[in-house]
């Protein structure tokens, strides 16, 4: 199959979250299955600064956006042996950030990604490249299935091309004023209850849900959750209309990148069969961060966006107890100003068993995974989550809230027929989190049982290989819809 991935971020070129990890890893697994896979993303300043052997292309497109023609130039490089195209427009993409600043999202994001979506489709024609599948990701690419269905339904060039739309996080829907439609090149007739209209605004994800051939989310549990009013973010009714075309496919992690046996960024490599290096990494992390060097004290790691979605309000309520507990907490992340300030003020109190590390420090993240005994993910909701899988790979036992992909990957001995690989809690309360964390801390004192659980987690398979096979099945469903 010829498969084109269209995404607003792709590791290693540009990243703000887990979306980039998926779009950087899944194509490689599909390529290994023998498919013709290609990727396209915007040519951001971040990409330009990174180098990546990017070359100027000969193709360009002219797109009518915001009442004037905007030119896009195409560049190209490779991700291993996968062709990668990048759409350049300095007005829209030569900025310090991908989507906005700490003050908020860029006010012209609707124009930026309308230009991107239209530019992608125009490029395909100029290249005479007809993908079997265009795989779109999140609201930034949601216009592609909409355009193909509503504007290009009679275009023979795309007549055999199908679309898969993946929802990585339903909370981000691409909501814009009705008046923005004209500037995005969208016909006002699409502003209806059965297309783009959503409480007086344009909802791009709604449009994609209603027009993509197949929709999927990034875990089976999250797929079920978003069909309910509690977790559907206002789109549960629309999703229910398409429930026969809605699937859950658990994300994986890149096992070549996240590999404690070969990771050069950690102090000592280790494997499930020879896990002794784990203790050396813990000692190195404690030393680096000024924590007491003690093997008997469980080290709890957390690498996360610092937002309420990730459970920071629960952590906030427990900080006084954590400061007095026989454990160490190492936290890395950036996010909402409220939590940044709170954690910085807490760290300033001189608590000697807590290390707060604010900012994006990619070299520290693998050291935390490798050095932690316990890994904390108390999310309010979590479509999939990658941190818990990386933690398992690096021998850290997760403590998670039982939601979304966390429920599909972490099994607590209390309520799972499967052998346990972590600890979980149901109620979104500080007490429920504290009870689960306390059970983990207590379990750590039984070294033999803990080592067994740790090795079980490390031996689990959360690679992209299984996920890639499931995506192949979705692609075949789409082709069948196209009569192929």
UniProtKB/Swiss-Prot annotation:
Q: Which UniProt keywords apply?
A: Glycogen biosynthesis, Glycosyltransferase, Transferase
Q: Which Gene3D superfamilies match?
A: Glycogen Phosphorylase B
Question: What does UniProt give as the signal peptide span?
Answer: none
Quote the EC number. 2.4.1.21
Q: Which reaction does it catalyse?
A: [(1->4)-alpha-D-glucosyl](n) + ADP-alpha-D-glucose = [(1->4)-alpha-D-glucosyl](n+1) + ADP + H(+)
GO CC terms in record: cytosol
Q: Which GO terms describe its molecular function?
A: alpha-1,4-glucan glucosyltransferase (ADP-glucose donor) activity; alpha-1,4-glucan glucosyltransferase (UDP-glucose donor) activity
Enzyme class comes to transferase
In this chain, ADP-alpha-D-glucose is annotated as bound at 15
CDD domains membership: GT5_Glycogen_synthase_DULL1-like
Gene Ontology biological-process entries: glycogen biosynthetic process
Q: What pathway does the UniProt record associate with this protein? A: Glycan biosynthesis; glycogen biosynthesis
Pfam entry (one): Glycos_transf_1
Name the family the entry cites.
Answer: Belongs to the glycosyltransferase 1 family. Bacterial/plant glycogen synthase subfamily.
Q: Which NCBIfam families match?
A: glgA, PRK00654.1-2
What PANTHER family does the record tag this protein with?
ALPHA AMYLASE DOMAIN-CONTAINING PROTEIN, GRANULE-BOUND STARCH SYNTHASE 1, CHLOROPLASTIC/AMYLOPLASTIC
What is the stated purpose of this protein?
Synthesizes alpha-1,4-glucan chains using ADP-glucose.
Q: What is this protein called?
A: Glycogen synthase
């Amino acid at each position: 199959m010829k498969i084109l991935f269209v995404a607003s971020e792709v590791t290693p070129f540009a990243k703000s979250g887990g979306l980039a990890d998926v779009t950087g890893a899944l194509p490689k697994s599909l390529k290994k299955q023998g498919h013709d896979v290609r990727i396209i993303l915007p040519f951001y300043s971040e990409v330009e600064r990174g180098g990546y052997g990017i070359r100027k292309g000969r193709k360009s497109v002219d797109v009518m956006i915001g009442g004037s023609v905007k030119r896009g130039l195409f560049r190209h490089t490779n991700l291993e042996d996968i062709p990668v195209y990048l759409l350049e427009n300095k007005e829209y993409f030569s900025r310090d950030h991908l989507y906005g600043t700490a003050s908020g999202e860029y006010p012209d994001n609707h124009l930026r990604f309308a230009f991107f979506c239209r530019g992608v489709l125009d490029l395909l024609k100029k290249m005479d490249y007809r993908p079997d599948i265009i795989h779109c990701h999140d609201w930034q690419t949601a216009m592609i299935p909409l355009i193909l269905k509503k504007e290009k339904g009679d275009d023979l060039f795309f007549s055999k091309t199908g679309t898969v739309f993946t929802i990585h996080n339903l909370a981000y829907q691409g909501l814009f004023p009705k008046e923005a439609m004209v500037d995005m090149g969208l016909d006002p007739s699409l502003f209806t209850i059965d297309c783009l209209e959503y409480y007086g605004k344009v909802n791009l994800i709604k449009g994609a849900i209603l027009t993509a051939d197949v929709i999927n989310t990034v875990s089976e549990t999250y797929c079920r959750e978003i069909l309910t009013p509690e977790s559907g973010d206002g789109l549960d009714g629309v999703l229910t209309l398409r429930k026969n075309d809605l699937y859950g496919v658990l994300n994986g992690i890149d096992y070549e990148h996240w590999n404690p046996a070969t990771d050069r960024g950690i102090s000592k490599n280790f494997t499930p069969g020879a896990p002794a290096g784990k203790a050396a990494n813990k000692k190195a992390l404690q030393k680096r961060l000024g924590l007491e060097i003690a093997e008997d004290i469980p080290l709890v790691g957390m690498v996360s966006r610092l937002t309420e979605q990730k459970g920071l309000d629960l952590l906030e309520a427990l900080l006084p107890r954590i400061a007095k507990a026989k454990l160490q907490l190492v936290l890395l992340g950036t996010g909402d100003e409220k939590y940044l300030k709170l954690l910085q003020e807490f760290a300033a109190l001189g608590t000697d068993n807590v290390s707060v590390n604010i900012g994006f420090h990619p070299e520290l993240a693998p050291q935390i995974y490798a050095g932690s005994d316990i890994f904390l993910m108390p999310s309010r909701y979590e479509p999939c989550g990658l941190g818990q899988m990386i933690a398992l790979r690096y021998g850290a036992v997760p403590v998670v809230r039982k939601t979304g992909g966390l429920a599909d990957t972490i099994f607590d001995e209390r309520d799972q027929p499967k052998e346990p690989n972590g600890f979980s809690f149901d109620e979104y309360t500080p007490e429920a989190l504290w009870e689960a964390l306390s059970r983990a801390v207590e379990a750590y004192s039984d070294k033999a049982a803990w080592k067994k659980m740790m090795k079980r987690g490390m031996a689990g398979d959360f690679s992209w290989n299984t996920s890639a096979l499931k995506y192949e099945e979705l692609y075949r469903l789409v082709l069948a819809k196209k009569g192929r």
